[in-house]
Amino acid sequence: ETAFQGKLKGTLRWLTLPDRVDLKGMIHGTLVFSLEEDWTQAGENSIPAGSLVALDPHDPQAKPEILFIPDSGKVLENAAVTRNTIIVTYLEHVQGRAMVLHASPDAKNRWHQVVLPLPDMSSVHIVDTDQSSDAAFLKVESFLSPPQLWLVGTTQPGLEQIRQIKPLFNAAELAVVQLQARSPDGTEISYFLVLPST
């Protein structure tokens, strides 16, 4: 179970959360967490495992707000909180993606989503975030590109590659393509092929 201690005169209040959640942090007094199991509340639609959810822990009657929900093509990987944003990494058709959810300090439960223009055919991982600012660091790498460190800044949001490991081979004449295979039960399976570009 999960307990919350806020402005409650030193007392704990138990939150009615599922048994299996992954707490990501607090932003503007709102608790952010991902679900590791389906969450069914009385009189409400079930929220599937793999969703990212925000909840006001001060209000016992507050309803959860879904920030990210998985579907047939998208899977949540991770999320982290800065001062005013939530950094979310996810897979979209097996390609790494990242987006920023901006929280307005003057409009409760209002989020603005910005998908970051990172390289395609890559994996994307959160390295670190700063809760005293809106800065975050992402690691991006692919079959042909060595690990890169990207800074997600504080405006719009700013995005800048600030470091890259020296390449171990010349990738100029190579290319990566994504293909689909179908299993006997009809499941679509993505795979990548590295081949000469000419």
Model-predicted segments: where are they?
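Short, conserved, GDST-rich strand-edge loop motifs in beta-rich repeat architectures
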Residues: 33-47
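Non-catalytic accessory segments flanking enzyme active sites
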Residues: 1-35, 66, 70, 77-81, ...
